[in-house]
Regions:
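ATP-dependent carboxylate-amine ligase
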Residues: 1-38, 43-49, 61, 65, ...
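Fold-independent oxyanion-binding glycine-rich loops
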Residues: 8, 30-31, 52-53, 68-70, ...
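Phosphate-binding loop of NTP-binding sites
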Residues: 19-22, 43, 57-58, 69, ...
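Short acidic loop-to-helix transition motifs that present clustered carboxylates
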Residues: 34-35, 55-57, 93-96, 139-143, ...
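Beta-strand->loop->alpha-helix junctions that form or flank phosphate-binding loops
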Residues: 50-53, 91-96, 134-138, 233-257, ...
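Glycine/charged-rich beta-loop-alpha catalytic/anionic-binding loops adjacent to active sites
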Residues: 101-104, 243, 267-277, 323-328
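Acidic-glycine-rich active-site phosphate/pyrophosphate-binding loop
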Residues: 253-273
Length: 460
């Protein structure tokens, strides 16, 4: 089968393209914005990419068009598909019908930590010899690819609550039918499609409704919103993490060396295993608890899973070191929600000690562009010594609010820019040896990471 994917460079659709290719299909695709690591991954798979959504792409005559949720009515190619009554489906529906239907699906849902937790879970199963298939919204460094199809009975998937397509407004995860589902956390996000937290809770309850009675829900026991979801109705076994009577970290963290930590995991009163790894922060320990509990559901002993986490390498764009120049380290992170920004900076502060942190932020997610959470930005940036914000001056990524005003509570610590080159000059001029620069965006950010490294190197 030849499938042509509209919106192929999104993290989900790009992974789906890889799965389709590995299943033996001919895959082509198009998108408006192409940037690493997804573009690199697709090209390595031999998938042809086409820039833009020109209507003449129907001349490729694929057997099926697979539509990403970035596509809306008015898109030239989509309009041509509709006018000609050509066959099309959504990405999640195609995945559910062609890949997941005969698998034991382990799904990871939640506002934050989905990508990291999915990667942890896939790695635990891999290290245990389960050879799982997976689809992750990033590139796990243990695998070097965001998606893989195997002949294993098990498939691990990052389960996103964003809507499926313009013609199917249900959350993507209702198509996955997991037997094991992690509900990692839940707070308001995606303000472009959800009016409030209650609307998101409804979608999460739809997910709960799809888990079979013999399945299991792994739930963050600290989250009131998730408890509200369960009170609407639950027909599956529930295990909680982050609370004393469930999976929890029972002993204080032990600092082994710079950038490393160890902690004991308990399941209720019983010690379940010790994790020694290079990750930092309470959020990653919570992610680990969820992954260990889910892996236990398919038969991996917790002590074995804990040992596997000692070999876990985090996902690209999750505090990924992009380079060092002039004594300054530059990190790349996907954080774009105030909670994620705060968590990222808190983790870096713990690692960096008294070293200066320079936060470089592009608030370009749909929620951030609407300004719904702009008032939370200053507090989320509290651990940064200097803040450099960027707002595109025009186009689809431009902000509907004033970034300078939003950052004003930070005083002289914060500056806002509308051009990337000016931003690079300012950051480079401010940086000192020993500083830690963390770039936070859910997009390519104009290749700013390499521009910063080049500017710092030229200054040295």
């Amino acid at each position: 089968m030849h499938i042509h994917i509209l919106g192929i460079c999104g993290t989900f659709m790009g992974g789906l393209a890889v799965l389709a290719r590995q299943a033996g299909h001919t895959v082509t695709g198009c998108d408006a914005n192409v940037y690493p690591p997804m573009s690199t991954q697709l090209e390595a798979q031999g998938i042809r990419l086409i820039e833009g959504f020109d209507a003449n792409q129907v001349s490729l005559e694929p057997d099926l068009f697979v539509i990403g949720n970035v596509v809306s009515r008015g898109n030239p190619l989509m309009e041509e598909i509709l006018n000609r009554n050509l066959p099309y489906t959504s990405g999640p529906q195609w995945l559910g019908e062609h890949v997941l239907s005969k698998k034991w699906v382990l799904a990871v849902a939640g506002t934050h930590g989905k990508t990291t937790t999915t990667s942890m879970l896939a790695w635990i199963l891999e290290d245990a010899g389960y050879n799982p298939g997976f689809l992750v919204g990033g590139v796990p460094m243990n695998f070097g690819i965001s998606a893989r199809l195997t002949d294993s009975d098990f498939f691990v998937i990052e389960a996103d609550e964003y809507d499926t397509a313009f013609f199917d407004k249900r959350s993507k995860f209702v198509h996955y039918h997991p037997r094991t589902a992690i509900l990692n956390n839940l707070e308001f996000d995606h303000a472009d499609i959800f009016p409030d937290l209650t609307a998101i809770e409804t979608q999460f309850h739809h997910l709960v409704r799809t888990v079979p009675g013999q399945g299991r829900l792994i739930v963050n026991g600290r989250e009131p919103a998730l408890e509200r979801v369960l009170t609407r109705g639950c027909w599956s076994e529930v295990e909680r993490f982050g609370v004393a009577d469930g999976w929890h970290v029972a002993e204080a963290n032990e600092t082994l060396a710079a950038g490393q930590e160890a902690f004991w995991v308990h399941q209720g009163p019983k010690a379940a295993g010790e994790v020694k790894w290079a990750l930092q922060g309470e959020h990653n320990r919570m992610n680990a608890l969820a992954a260990l509990a889910a892996a236990r559901h398919v038969g991996v002993p917790p002590e074995q899973g804990a040992a596997s986490l000692g070999k876990f390498q985090n996902v690209k764009r999750r505090m990924e070191v992009r380079g060092e120049a002039a004594g300054v380290t530059v990190y790349d992170d996907f954080a774009h929600h105030p909670t994620a920004i705060q968590t990222t900076l808190a983790g870096l502060r713990r690692r960096a000690g008294k070293a200066r942190i320079l936060a470089v932020l592009e608030p370009r997610s749909n929620t951030m562009k609407l300004g719904v959470m702009k008032a939370q930005l200053p507090a989320s940036l509290a651990d940064a010594d200097l803040v450099f914000g960027y707002g595109a001056p025009s186009g689809k990524d431009s902000l509907g609010w004033n970034l300078t005003e939003a950052l004003a509570p930070l005083g002289v610590r914060a500056q806002a820019f509308s051009d990337i080159d000016g931003l690079v000059r300012a950051v480079s001029a401010a940086a000192q040896p020993g500083d830690q620069i963390v770039v936070m965006s859910n997009g390519g950010f104009g290749g700013i990471h390499q521009k910063l490294l080049d500017a710092l190197a030229a200054r040295a």
